[in-house]
């Protein structure tokens, strides 16, 4: 049954969802909105959330000793091992439940939050292990496309042409030249999983995917497009607008993969050119001022077009053909 936004707003108007005001994340940051969306649905479905936090913007800004913005059990571990940590928590829960030490009617949701640095790169091995072993954990990636907590270094998620401190736009190179990793396909390759993309500009799609992920009998993964206003150089009231542009330009297609079956969940009737997405952000300003800017933008447009067509093909050929 689809989640009703008005009902959610009324339900959580005065009810605690797990993260409170007073955290130190930047105004306009996509991460706390992501957390609130996920926690609201978990609570709405009757789950008690247990949270793991990889080192990163979200962790350092919500749990600076001796303060915390969390009102649910949470664990801060290292940069690279939140998936491994939550695998252990989920396994301990099952052991205690088998011994009768946890009531049968008590529902827990084990949720790991990590940024792109701790997911695409540093934590990829522990994430893969969690998926392969089949732990019932929801891993939520807030993807701000760089190591933003430490000052905007490039990551495996940083797109071509983005200006970062470790891959700056200069005379010889137009910023980062490598393509962004396709993390959802990497996760989906583990086969018996649920993996999806989400955008803050599409809350109903977001909520539906969180519900499906939490109720999935196995590991689940949600990649959320999470603008960083500080290093993307956008105004703090543009978070949702940038997120919407990402969807409308095919830069961030919305889809899900359930046990190998692809489904595109948003198909805009008309797409905007990817250049509109680039022009809306200061991190691409130097790229767009280069003499070869048109050539680079055209290449990126061709790439997102091809990727979109590939997604539609995968949706067609995997329809009704789950791995298991």
UniProtKB/Swiss-Prot annotation:
UniProt-annotated stretches for the region Disordered: 150-172
Low complexity bias locations: 155-166
EC number, UniProt record: 1.2.7.1
Cofactors (names): [4Fe-4S] cluster
Keyword Metal-binding recorded: yes
Annotated cofactor note: Binds 1 [4Fe-4S] cluster per subunit.
Gene3D superfamilies noted in UniProt: 3.40.50.970
Protein name in the entry: Pyruvate synthase subunit PorB
Organism listed in the record: Thermotoga maritima (strain ATCC 43589 / DSM 3109 / JCM 10099 / NBRC 100826 / MSB8)
Record gene name: porB
